[in-house]
Amino acid sequence: VNTDGAEPLIRLFHVSKQYTRDQRALDDVTLEIARGELVFLTGPSGAGKSTLLRLLFAAEAPTHGQIVIAGRNIHRMRQSGIPLLRRNIGVVFQDFKLLANRTVWDNVAFAMEVVGHPPREIRRRVGIVLRQVGLADKVHTFPDRLSGGEQQRVAIARALVNEPAILLADEPTGNLDPALTFEIMNLLVDVNIRGTTVLVATHDPRLLEAFPRRCIALRDGRITEDGA
């Protein structure tokens, strides 16, 4: 929780998301996340974790309420401002979403190419993040030759290459065995220590026990618990 008096990086005010009249994925959610926090979003399947992350990424808009990131109300922004917002938010999914016909290097570089970075800067940043995630020796490897843990590390490198202030990880260890689960979580902790604000959606109790951090529990779209 924010204790230094600085403005929270992420603020939600009475946010609800309703897909149908009977289906409310989020119900009156209010919370603040400080710059530099690592926060777990927990709860059973269907609790609203993924919906919350999609709203933060502006992939969807809330039915009610306001979302403010770095002082900007993201759903009052012009449509032209959304790509700039997303450039400041990295996203990691459970199923990696790697390009099968591209090498590790190309998968990570692509995230910089699409926003127009010059080749020299792309080479510099891709090299840095692949070393950070421990894949400097796999740059020419294709995804189908990687383990599940290595594929997830590529996905994390891709999410970090544009130096986002926020990393959203949606069940990032959901498809991994226990040893790889802790390997990926240690990497996310390292990312957080380097200054990135990290939100991890998970229903894996082992992570919560092994990495005691602030935990926001959701059930039926409502926050039921918020604390360490």
Residue ranges with predicted function:
Residues 57:
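Helix-to-loop junction immediately C-terminal to a conserved catalytic motif
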Residues 20, 74-90, 119, 191-193:
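ABC ATPase NBD coupling module
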Residues 167-170:
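Catalytic Walker B motif of ABC-type/P-loop ATPase nucleotide-binding domains
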Residues 65-73:
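Conserved ABC transporter NBD signature motif
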Residues 163:
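Conserved catalytic motifs of ABC-family nucleotide-binding domains
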Residues 142-146, 150-152:
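Conserved ABC ATPase signature
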Residues 102-110:
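Short coil-to-helix segment of the ABC ATPase nucleotide-binding domain corresponding to the Q-loop/switch region
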